[in-house]
Each structure stands twice: as C-alpha cells, then as structure tokens.
C-alpha cells in the first residue's frame, strides 16, 4: 500500500523539518519526504493548508480492560484515542486482574493486536495487586512487554518499597511512573482544599498531599540514581520541586494533563462531578505555575490521564462520585487552544510534549517523521474552530467537563502504520 500526503506543512522536532512538503509511505513505512513525489499507484491525501506532525503518544491512560469493560475496553478506548490524534498509548495497570504478571501484560498486547485501532503499550504494576506491599516481578514484566512500572491510582506509601523498586527498575532499564499522594494527608478529601471547598462544604484535599510525595520520590531517585517520572503534576510547589531536582541532576521527567492548565477548582461549582479528578483541580495560581513549567521545560510531557467512568458512577452525589475524566478526544485541541494560541508554547514545543518526549520516556521508537520509520502521523488545521460534543465521543464514557467548549486543532486525519484510521474527522 502506498499513501501520499501532499502539500502539508510538515513539522518534525527530531529532524527539524518545518516546511510545506510531501510524505510517501509504502507498506506502512515512511519511504520519502520531499517535493513532487510521483502519485502513481498512491492513495493521496491533500493536506494543503494543514499541518502534518508525528502521531501523538499518550504516556498515561486507562483502558479499563480487563475487568471494567462497562466503562471502556481496548476497542472503544483506542477508537477514542485515534479520534483525538493519538497513534500510540500506554495504559495503566489498575485493571481487574491487575497487570502485575507476564500473562496479563501479554493479554493487553494480544487483545490490542486484534481489537485495537493503534499501538497499545501496557504499563506493569509496580507492586503485586497494587497493594504496595510486595514488588512485582519487574524483569518478568519488562520482558513480557511492559514499557514502564506504576501503581497509578494509588501511591506507593511504603518508602522502603519505593527505594527497592527504583533500584530494581534501574537494573532492568525501565522507568517508574509515580502517582504522588500521601493518603494520610488526603484524609478522604474530595476536592482541592481552599476557598471553593469551604463554599461547597466539601472536605478538602490539600496540595501538600501531592507535594510531600513528590519530594520523597525525588529524594529517593537522587539517592538511588534511578529514573523517575512524576505523573499528573497539579501544584505550584510540585513544579518548583521538580525544577530544582532537575537543576541538581536528578533523572526526573514530569507530566501534567490538560485539565490542570485549563481548569481551576471553580469547575466544581454546582457539585459538578465531571470536574472531580485526582489529583484535584487546583487554584489559578497553580494553573499559572503549570503553564510556566511547560514553558520552561520543567514539565516534559502532556498526558491525558484518560479515565472513563460509567454515567452511574458520576451521576451521584459528589462524595461518592468516581475520580477522573475522559481525555483522548479533547487533549490536543485543549493544548492548541490554551497553550499554542496564547503563545505559551510553539506548535513545535507542543509536539515535543505530546509525541517525541513521551516516546522517549517510554523507550518507544515513535514521535518522529523520518525515512525508515513507521508512518504514524496526524493532520490538522490549527485555525479551524469546533465545538466539543460529548455525544460524538468514541469512548464508551462521556465524563468530560468540556462539553460545549469552542476549541481549535481537532485532528482531521490519524494515520497508524501508513493506514488512515480517521479521515476527515470520521473514524474508519
């Protein structure tokens, strides 16, 4: 199969390519990048006036498969991801059964091959059963195909266990993704502790509950010389802690999510359960710090933390509603609208944070447009506005606080291995 993308503004952060040109993919591989490529025998996409970049890579999502398929499964989750411009996703292990052994890791890999619309990479559980008591067989998980380790959804509260995990992970050259949360400080808090929680009469989850654990993990990473990735950073001090650790030479990368640079805890007004996430939405001061961290490189990656929940888990009182929101289909447009359009990031910097950097952190061979590499690409109009409509989401779940929002940059084409899976915004 030959696919020719003509006259698109091709942007690639690794090669420095930033011009209008053509891309020819043959049998899924990028064969040529240049002008006036022969169209004979090709399926042609006219990308005039559009940007062509490497496909997005999500380093943090929840596909809920196995065990929670009523919320999402590998088919519906990857359909949703493809619609949002993702060509590769790494899924967290908090499934049922947990992804804490070779069989479960291979289950995800094999099911993704038959049911998935894009590349799926499982993240293995750091501890057995996500209980934080005993390390999983890290070597077994790595050799089975896990691309990282995490107990995401719960913190590793035992500092000794985390220290050992870092030492073993270093031996197997695999990164730990840390969900930083001190449950004693959370103390059953439901949203950010502050003015809004007081107004709503809801128990608060203080910023130090996140920051204390970020500090602990940075200290342990510095001591063990391990590589650590801090998930879903949401606070000003959290950004400062990571910035200072990087200056000291700690091998740390960090991510945030679109809701942490677009929303504050004001979104919880009216007891809006679609704005209930973990870590919670913070204050405008924290949002500003997250944006600054993205600008100065402290925060390397934008992930979705796509967390689908059935309507029955959200359409309840705030106290018992599930944490999380869906993110695949709004992440890139939110980043374009709130980061690129205001001038906080260039489009090239955004591609770094949503494609190249997550690929590097996970050790994937993705995030670039080079001859000989798989043709994982997206095509989009930076200036076309659209309105978010949750009824059009491909995800089984619709728990998003962004319904009705006007955004820019919705992907028009998503191409995985040289094959279009989304064409003119329609999933094929």
UniProtKB/Swiss-Prot annotation:
Gene: pyrC
Broad class of enzyme this protein falls into: hydrolase
Cofactor requirement: Zn(2+)
This protein's name: Dihydroorotase
Bound cofactor: record note: Binds 2 Zn(2+) ions per subunit.
GO biological process, one term: purine nucleobase catabolic process
Keyword match Glycoprotein: no
Catalyzed chemical reaction(s): (S)-dihydroorotate + H2O = N-carbamoyl-L-aspartate + H(+)
Active site: 305
Xref: PANTHER family: ALLANTOINASE
Natural source organism: Ruminiclostridium cellulolyticum (strain ATCC 35319 / DSM 5812 / JCM 6584 / H10)
Gene Ontology CC: cytoplasm
């Amino acid at each position: 199969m030959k696919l020719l993308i003509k006259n698109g503004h091709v942007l690639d952060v690794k090669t420095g390519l930033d011009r209008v040109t053509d891309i020819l993919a043959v049998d899924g591989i990028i064969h040529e990048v240049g002008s006036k490529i022969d169209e004979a025998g090709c399926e042609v996409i006219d990308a005039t006036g559009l940007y062509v970049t490497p496909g997005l890579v999500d380093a943090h999502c929840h596909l809920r498969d196995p065990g929670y398929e009523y919320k999402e499964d590998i088919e519906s989750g990857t359909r949703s991801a493809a619609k949002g411009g993702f060509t590769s996703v790494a899924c967290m292990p908090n499934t049922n059964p947990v992804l804490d052994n070779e069989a479960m890791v291979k289950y995800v890999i094999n099911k993704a091959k038959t049911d998935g619309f894009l590349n799926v990479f499982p993240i293995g559980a750091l501890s057995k059963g996500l209980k934080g008591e005993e390390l999983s067989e890290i070597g077994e998980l790595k050799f089975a195909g896990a691309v990282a380790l995490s107990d995401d959804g719960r913190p590793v509260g035992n500092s000794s266990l985390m220290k050992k995990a870092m030492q073993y992970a270093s031996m197997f050259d695999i990164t730990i993704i840390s969900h930083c949360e001190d449950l004693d400080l959370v103390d059953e808090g439901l949203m950010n502790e502050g003015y809004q929680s007081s107004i709503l009469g809801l128990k608060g989850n203080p910023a130090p509950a996140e920051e204390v654990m970020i500090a602990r993990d940075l200290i342990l990473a510095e001591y063990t010389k391990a590589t650590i990735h801090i998930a879903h950073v949401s606070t000003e001090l959290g950004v400062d802690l990571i910035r200072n650790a990087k200056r000291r030479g700690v091998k740390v990368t960090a991510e945030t999510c679109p809701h942490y640079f677009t929303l504050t805890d004001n979104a919880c007004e009216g007891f809006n359960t679609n704005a209930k996430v973990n870590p919670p939405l913070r204050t405008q001061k924290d949002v500003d710090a997250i944006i600054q961290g993205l600008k100065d490189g402290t925060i390397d990656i934008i992930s979705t933390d796509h967390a689908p929940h059935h309507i029955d888990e959200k359409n309840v009182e705030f106290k018992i509603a599930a944490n999380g929101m869906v993110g695949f289909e709004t992440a890139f447009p939110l980043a374009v609208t709130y980061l690129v359009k205001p001038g906080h990031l260039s489009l090239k910097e955004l591609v770094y944070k949503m494609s190249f950097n997550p690929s590097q952190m996970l050790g994937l061979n993705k995030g670039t447009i080079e001859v000989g590499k798989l043709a994982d690409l997206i095509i989009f109009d930076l200036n076309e506005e659209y309105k978010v409509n949750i009824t059009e989401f491909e995800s089984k779940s619709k728990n998003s606080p962004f319904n009705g929002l006007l955004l820019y940059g919705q992907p028009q084409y998503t191409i995985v291995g040289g094959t279009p899976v989304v064409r003119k915004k329609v999933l094929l």
